[in-house]
C-alpha cells in the first residue's frame, strides 16, 4: 500500500535522521499524526527555532545561542587546558561529569580517508591557530572517540602540536574501543580523564 503524499513526505523526513530506518520513521510519522495539533505545532516551532537561533562559537566551535559560548566566556574555567572533542554532544558528555574545568575545542568530525574526510574538513586548522594566538595553553587533552578515525585524528593533532612544546595527552582507555564518548557514563569518563596519557 502506498501512503498518502503528506505521510510519505513525513516518513521521508524522519529517515534523514541518523539511526532512523523506514520502520521507525513510519512509527514516528504516525505518532505525530496522533498528537494534538498544538503539540505538533510546538514541536515544529522548536525545530525551526533550534535551526534558526543556534550557531557555532567562534572560539571553540561548540553549538551555542551566544557568541562566544558560555564556557568560553566563563572566567572561572582553567584557561591553560583545552579538551578536543569530535562533536558538541561529546562536550556535553564531558560537562556532565563536572570534573573537567578547562576549555574545549569541537572538531566537528574525525579524519576518515575512507569517507573522504581529511584534516582540512574538520576544525584542526582553527585549533592550531587558537594555540598560536593564546600562549596561556599548557595542555591539550585529545578526547576523540576510541575508534580508528578518532585515533588517527588524535595522532595527527599530536604531531602538529608536539613541536610547540604544549603537552598533548589522550584520554585513558576505560572507554570501550569503537565506542562513542557521548554514551560513556560519568564514572568511566572521570577515570579516563584521570588516567589520560601523553601522546
UniProtKB/Swiss-Prot annotation:
<dbReference type="InterPro" id="IPR000093">
    <property type="entry name" value="DNA_Rcmb_RecR"/>
</dbReference>
<dbReference type="GO" id="GO:0003677">
    <property type="term" value="F:DNA binding"/>
</dbReference>
<dbReference type="Pfam" id="PF21175">
    <property type="entry name" value="RecR_C"/>
</dbReference>
<comment type="function">
    <text>May play a role in DNA repair. It seems to be involved in an RecBC-independent recombinational process of DNA repair. It may act with RecF and RecO.</text>
</comment>
<keyword id="KW-0233">DNA recombination</keyword>
<keyword id="KW-0862">Zinc</keyword>
<dbReference type="Pfam" id="PF02132">
    <property type="entry name" value="RecR_ZnF"/>
</dbReference>
<keyword id="KW-0227">DNA damage</keyword>
<dbReference type="InterPro" id="IPR015967">
    <property type="entry name" value="Rcmb_RecR_Znf"/>
</dbReference>
<dbReference type="Pfam" id="PF13662">
    <property type="entry name" value="Toprim_4"/>
</dbReference>
<feature type="domain" description="Toprim">
    <location>
        <begin position="80"/>
        <end position="176"/>
    </location>
</feature>
<comment type="similarity">
    <text>Belongs to the RecR family.</text>
</comment>
<keyword id="KW-0863">Zinc-finger</keyword>
<keyword id="KW-0479">Metal-binding</keyword>
<keyword id="KW-0234">DNA repair</keyword>
<feature type="zinc finger region" description="C4-type">
    <location>
        <begin position="57"/>
        <end position="72"/>
    </location>
</feature>
<dbReference type="InterPro" id="IPR006171">
    <property type="entry name" value="TOPRIM_dom"/>
</dbReference>
<dbReference type="InterPro" id="IPR034137">
    <property type="entry name" value="TOPRIM_RecR"/>
</dbReference>
<dbReference type="GO" id="GO:0008270">
    <property type="term" value="F:zinc ion binding"/>
</dbReference>
<dbReference type="InterPro" id="IPR023627">
    <property type="entry name" value="Rcmb_RecR"/>
</dbReference>
<protein>
    <recommendedName>
        <fullName>Recombination protein RecR</fullName>
    </recommendedName>
</protein>
<dbReference type="Pfam" id="PF21176">
    <property type="entry name" value="RecR_HhH"/>
</dbReference>
<dbReference type="GO" id="GO:0006310">
    <property type="term" value="P:DNA recombination"/>
</dbReference>
<dbReference type="GO" id="GO:0006281">
    <property type="term" value="P:DNA repair"/>
</dbReference>
